Amino acid sequence: MKRQKRDRFERAHTQGFKAGLHGRSKDNCPYQTQDDFRSHWLGGWRDAMEARNTGLFR
């Protein structure tokens, strides 16, 4: 059985989360011209910032 491709929106969210954990700026979003993907990336970034502020990650 073939492995399904990942959902591109989920991948954008995950990449945004990783960027947020590493303390990168939201201006470094690789999806500047693609609003749908940018929205998911920023959602992941915001989730990471919230997790950092609550002390879940350093």
Swiss-Prot record:
GO terms for cellular component: cytoplasm. Pfam families: RMF. It comes from the Bacteria. InterPro entries: Ribosome_modulation_factor (IPR007040), RMF_sf (IPR023200). Signal peptide: none annotated. GO terms for biological process: regulation of translation. HAMAP family: RMF. This is Ribosome modulation factor. It comes from Idiomarina loihiensis (strain ATCC BAA-735 / DSM 15497 / L2-TR). The lineage of its organism: Bacteria, Pseudomonadati, Pseudomonadota, Gammaproteobacteria, Alteromonadales. The gene is rmf.
